[in-house]
């Protein structure tokens, strides 16, 4: 669960994780605003294809007492809202939605015995998304928070992990196959 994601192209990153199941529990952590806020971002989500949603990033809840980088302070507190639209709603296996103005994210869940394989794919809608490596490091860090939530273990420090991974993902993206 520590492996970095892979850039399938400079405009798409895929991260695979094995999570403790059952799949319905993992689905709840993706779709229930209160549970999602514990590891990623809260906010309402209409449970249907075409449904409206709003992610509310308020990282003081997942990184209490941590100091974020200057350009991310608004995410720590007071928080940041991102509207979106649900693209796929296939409980409890597939969730996809728009992310920011230029990209989409998809979560695919597959049962593997008592565990669940999560495949997260974040892709630019256009040809390129210059800051996709930042999104990739964010997803990697947020998924570490999700794993801790599901396992009932202490959360790793968010911002130090994010900073380290951002540099790693920038290198990985530079070596991605060209589309």
Where are the language model's segments positioned?
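Conserved beta-strand residues within beta-sheet cores
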Residues: 23, 81-83, 106
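Beta-strand elements of well-folded, non-transmembrane domains
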Residues: 21, 61, 124-126
């Amino acid at each position: 669960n520590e492996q970095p994601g892979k850039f399938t192209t400079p405009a798409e990153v895929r991260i695979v994780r094995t999570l403790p199941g059952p799949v319905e529990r993992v689905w709840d952590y993706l779709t229930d605003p209160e549970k999602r806020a514990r590891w990623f971002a809260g906010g309402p989500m209409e449970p249907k294809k075409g449904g409206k949603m709003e992610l509310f990033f308020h990282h003081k809840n997942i990184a209490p007492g941590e100091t974020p980088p200057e350009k991310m302070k608004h995410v720590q507190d007071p928080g940041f809202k991102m509207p979106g639209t649900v693209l796929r709603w296939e409980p409890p296996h597939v969730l996809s939605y728009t992310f920011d103005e230029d990209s989409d994210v998809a979560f695919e869940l597959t049962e593997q015995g008592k565990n669940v394989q999560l495949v997260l794919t974040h892709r630019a809608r256009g040809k390129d998304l210059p800051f996709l490596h930042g999104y990739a490091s964010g997803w990697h860090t947020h998924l570490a928070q999700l794993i801790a939530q599901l396992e009932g273990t202490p959360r790793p420090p968010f911002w130090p992990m994010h900073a380290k991974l951002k540099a790693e993902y920038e290198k990985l993206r530079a070596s991605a196959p060209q589309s």
